[in-house]
Amino acid sequence: MNPTDPQHEPLRVGPTKILPAGVIQFQEYLSGETGIEVIIDARTRESYVATVALVPYGAPHPGAGGVWLKGWSENEGVPQALELAGVVRLTGRKHRSGWVIADHGELTERALQVRDHQLHQRKR
């Protein structure tokens, strides 16, 4: 493995209205959907789940490389910050879940590479 490969470089995001800037860490739900966590302090590994690639009640599967993003409450502006950082491309699709609406995004090619690398490293 070459440490200069793009998947070895962290993806950064933020700040948003409420959250400070941080580094993206990908997770995977048991159902296979992608989760996104923002690590705020890399030294202490303090994390804040700034955007959980939600599985909103009744929502269709987000698709391969797709995510449902929480952009309300403390996560206001997070989907837009993820797009600005080159992590996702917002598709304009939305899904109402109760009183809130989740935004649909698709991971960029670079984000897919980083996600696959991070998940592979954890499974070793």
Locate the predicted segments by residue.
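Short alpha-helical segments that sit at the start of domains
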Residues: 2-58
